């Protein structure tokens, strides 16, 4: 079977970030508003720094009473303007960030629905949930939140440098000699953050997967007293995650300390050169205070720009994980032949299929015909290829060689959506969704059916007795995965769903294997109403349920080794007769 390679190809960080920014295009007006707000913030901050000269010279040296009166009012006005501008920036950026996170979640889930079934075998659900959850949130941080910090603090630095250049360009240029060293520090920090961020996201997925397995199977964990081993496994993964988080904190702390040290070097140079300029009469006390205040304002801004690398690189790592999904090829859907309602003639011609990494095929030269209105039972030992064969009909997988025909045409000739409309599936593990009974029966494209149709199939599926006993009837909430219903009740709702779909092809995948006798009788009775006038394929675990099948296919190691009716196969005394006798032989008492 064709399966996507597990290898992930990452683009360069800059190309990834540029691609991320394309998702912000739809919200460019919000970003323009935010940029205007950030610019106003920077102007207000720079104006305050520039005012340090008149505050010092006019108030403390010249003792100008008029300036001493209007300066406090001007400062209050500046900070009021800065607060309003900051609010506008935060609101616009926040709305854009959350919108982008939502867009990524919807896009990625939409893409997962278009991927081939092999992807779901190769990637744990926990990893998918991490992509939809924290990865999407990290991307929003990288696109918007990191951008906000970079824009705000960069404008703050530029504004402070303009003030410094205005009052003494010689002092400012001398201080800027430390800029190349600062750029080198930030580059090294970015590379380290990016490397660690990839590992952290993978570690988060492993943590979620371990917790999901332990909690989903809590009954087995308790019965087999496996709490300690599960906790040890989870703690080991949590310790790995902790180690990575500590590396992030270590990198952040060291980079912040390095920036502060470079800032201190800049301040020392400022004091040295400014003192020389003051002695030469080229620098007033007000000039010096403005320079010093501007330099002090630059240091925390540079520190934030260094720290934003963590947010930015984590977002880029998450974006690369998301883009690895979005760039994966969709399941093949190249058919153009329209299909209203099929007759249901299914023909397998020399089908061979193989799982990746396995030399032996899971299906080997399988050929048979299932005529409309007939029941084809598929039996065999575990691992003989029964479920793999069934999954080829809705094209969840593609065969390696051979052809599968529906009504005389290859499955690939039909549109996937049209093909799957012809199929109803009832499996052993029935998946119900959190919602009402009515919602679970009238599922997907059947949502618009009238309530009378739902009530009819509930009766036909032998589900009316337990539905009528529920406090809200068809509006009863079944809970997550149908957890408020028994296995037999869930199975009958799945049959009701298949009845409502009224598809010409019915696939039953061991639909009664895990039921008690009473539930099995009710389900079998409902299936007898469902199967007539359809092409039915049954994977049977209990061989007593297929005695009346039109043909029985016996599989072993991916091949059909026997075929015929129940009576014919018993008479041949082959594998089918052996399996049947193993189920029904009398044991000595």
Swiss-Prot record:
It comes from the Bacteria. Pfam families: ABC_membrane, ABC_tran. The keyword Ribosomal protein does not apply. It catalyses: ATP + H2O + lipid A-core oligosaccharideSide 1 = ADP + phosphate + lipid A-core oligosaccharideSide 2. It is found in: Cell inner membrane. GO terms for cellular component: plasma membrane. It is a multi-pass membrane protein. ATP binds at residues 380-387. The chain crosses the membrane at residues 29-49, 68-88, 157-177, 254-274, 283-303. PANTHER family: ATP-BINDING CASSETTE SUB-FAMILY B MEMBER 10, MITOCHONDRIAL (PTHR43394:SF1), ATP-DEPENDENT PERMEASE MDL1, MITOCHONDRIAL (PTHR43394). In MsbA the ATP-binding domain (NBD) and the transmembrane domain (TMD) are fused. This is ATP-dependent lipid A-core flippase. It comes from Xylella fastidiosa (strain Temecula1 / ATCC 700964).
């Amino acid at each position: 079977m064709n399966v996507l390679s597990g290898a992930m190809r990452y683009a360069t960080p800059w190309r990834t970030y540029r691609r991320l920014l394309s998702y912000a295009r739809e919200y460019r007006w919000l970003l323009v508003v935010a940029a205007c707000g950030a610019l106003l913030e920077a102007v207000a901050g720079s104006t305050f720094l520039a005012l340090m000269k008149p505050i010092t010279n006019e108030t403390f040296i010249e003792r100008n009473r008029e300036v001493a009166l209007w300066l406090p009012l001007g400062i209050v006005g500046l900070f009021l303007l800065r607060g309003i501008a900051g609010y506008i920036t935060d609101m616009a950026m926040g709305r854009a960030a959350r919108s982008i996170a939502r867009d990524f979640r919807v896009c990625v889930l939409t893409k997962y629905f278009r991927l081939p079934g092999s992807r779901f075998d190769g990637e744990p659900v926990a990893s998918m949930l991490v992509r939809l959850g924290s990865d999407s949130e990290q991307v929003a941080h990288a696109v918007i939140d990191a951008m906000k910090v970079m824009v705000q603090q960069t404008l703050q630095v530029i504004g402070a440098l303009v003030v410094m250049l205005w009052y003494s360009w010689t002092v400012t240029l001398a201080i800027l000699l430390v800029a190349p060293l600062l750029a080198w520090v930030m580059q090294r920090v970015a590379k380290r953050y990016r490397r660690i961020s990839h590992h952290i996201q993978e570690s988060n997925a492993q943590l979620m997967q371990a917790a999901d397995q332990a909690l989903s199977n809590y009954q087995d964990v308790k019965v087999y007293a496996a709490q300690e081993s599960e906790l040890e496994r989870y703690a080991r993964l949590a310790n790995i995650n902790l180690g990575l988080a500590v590396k992030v904190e270590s990198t952040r702390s060291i980079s912040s300390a390095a920036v502060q040290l470079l800032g201190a070097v800049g301040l020392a140079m400022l004091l040295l050169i400014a003192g020389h300029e003051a002695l030469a009469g080229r620098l007033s006390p007000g000039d010096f205070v403005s320079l010093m205040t501007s330099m002090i304002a630059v240091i925390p801004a540079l520190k934030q720009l260094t720290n934003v690398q963590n947010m930015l690189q984590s977002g880029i790592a998450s974006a690369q994980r998301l883009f690895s999904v979005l760039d994966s090829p969709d399941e093949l859907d190249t058919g153009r032949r329209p299909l209203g309602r099929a007759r249901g003639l299914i023909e397998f011609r020399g089908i061979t299929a193989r799982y990746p990494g396995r030399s032996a095929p899971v299906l080997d030269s399988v050929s048979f015909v299932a005529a409309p209105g007939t029941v084809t039972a598929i039996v065999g030992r575990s691992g003989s290829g029964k479920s793999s064969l069934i999954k080829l009909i809705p094209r969840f997988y593609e065969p390696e060689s051979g052809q599968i025909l529906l009504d005389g045409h290859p499955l690939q000739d039909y549109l996937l959506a049209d093909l799957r409309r012809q199929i109803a599936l009832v499996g052993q593990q029935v998946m119900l969704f959190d919602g009402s009974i009515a919602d679970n029966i009238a599922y997907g494209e059947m949502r618009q059916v009238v309530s009378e149709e739902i009530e009819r199939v509930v009766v036909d599926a032998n589900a009316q007795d337990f539905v009528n006993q529920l406090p809200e009837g068809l509006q009863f909430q079944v809970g997550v995965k149908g957890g408020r219903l028994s296995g037999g009740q869930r199975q009958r709702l799945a049959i009701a769903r298949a009845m409502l779909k009224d598809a010409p092809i019915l696939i039953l995948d061991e639909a009664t294997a895990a039921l008690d006798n009473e539930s099995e009788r009710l389900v079998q009775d409902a299936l007898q109403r469902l199967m007539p006038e359809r092409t039915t394929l049954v994977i049977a675990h209990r061989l007593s349920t297929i005695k009346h099948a039109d043909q029985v296919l016996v599989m072993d190691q991916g091949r059909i080794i026997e075929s015929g009716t129940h009576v014919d196969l018993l008479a041949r005394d082959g594998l089918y007769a052996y399996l049947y006798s193993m189920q029904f032989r009398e044991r000595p008492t």
